[in-house]
């Protein structure tokens, strides 16, 4: 999955240089996926869906690490991931091995990708300029009864992320920070039933760089209270 964007730690963004072929660079993207594992595990501990035998869509899949985890540990039937970063997708295809995974370079669900049981993203919504269009696209990609789980910590009510966004939005070409209430309303308007919860996070890995920019309690508050798991269910 894309995008919390700080080199060398598990998720607090720092100013970065984005690449057309990778989110950051080959080495940094690989490190980012490893650093996100504790959040991925928390997502899987929190959701209320049995993934065994399901067809899964990963929105902003980067190098495919989350789908490999689902194939190895959750017994999914098929996994499909898309991402605009060309080289990251090439890596995802190579690393998939014989797993039932497919990856495409795209900024939206590719044509013909539909009928999914479950979709996921981790910190992708804040990057998108047109969330109503995204909500509609994912609604169409899911089968009736399908569920879209989206983790969102970069939003207007998160003090750490508001500070980071103010410093980096112009250089990164980011849209204005979204309010969670507005995000929920857009997905509701697209036809979803909306629910929200906090991630079941246990220990948070703390890199030394964290403490150069934020107090430990602020970092914990971000992960425990401000990083929200949104559930969008298609009736």
Would you name each region that the model predicts?
Residues 1-50, 69, 149-174:
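Conserved class I S-adenosyl-L-methionine
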Residues 63-108:
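Class I SAM-dependent methyltransferase SAM/SAH-binding core
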Residues 120:
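A conserved beta-strand element that flanks and buttresses the S-adenosyl-L-methionine
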Residues 123-127:
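Short catalytic micro-motifs in class I SAM-dependent methyltransferases
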Residues 132-144:
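A short glycine-rich, Lys/Arg-flanked "PGG" loop and its adjoining helix->strand segment in the class I
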Residues 162-163, 195-235:
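A C-terminal cap/extension of S-adenosyl-L-methionine-dependent methyltransferases
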Residues 175-191, 196-197:
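Short alpha-helix
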């Amino acid at each position: 999955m894309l995008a919390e964007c700080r080199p060398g730690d598990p998720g607090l963004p720092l100013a970065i240089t984005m690449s057309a072929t990778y989110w950051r660079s080959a080495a940094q993207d690989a490190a980012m996926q490893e650093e996100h594992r504790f959040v991925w595990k928390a997502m899987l501990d929190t959701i209320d869906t049995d993934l065994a035998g399901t067809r899964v869509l990963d929105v902003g899949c980067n190098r495919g690490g989350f789908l490999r985890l689902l194939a190895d540990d959750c017994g999914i039937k098929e996994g499909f991931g898309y991402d605009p970063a060309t080289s990251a997708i090439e890596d995802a295809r190579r690393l998939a091995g014989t797993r039932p995974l497919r990856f495409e370079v795209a900024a939206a669900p590719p044509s013909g990708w539909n009928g999914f049981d479950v979709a996921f993203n981790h910190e992708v919504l804040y990057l998108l300029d047109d969330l109503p269009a995204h909500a509609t696209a994912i609604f169409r990609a899911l089968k009736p009864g399908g569920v879209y789980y989206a983790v969102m910590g970069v939003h207007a009510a998160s003090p750490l992320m508001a500070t980071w966004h103010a410093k980096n939005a112009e250089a990164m070409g980011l849209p204005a920070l979204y309010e969670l209430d507005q995000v929920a309303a857009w997905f509701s308007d697209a036809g979803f039933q909306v629910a929200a919860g906090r991630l079941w996070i246990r220990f948070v890995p703390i890199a030394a760089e964290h403490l150069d920019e934020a107090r430990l309690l602020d970092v914990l508050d971000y992960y425990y209270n401000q990083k929200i798991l949104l559930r969008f269910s298609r009736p």
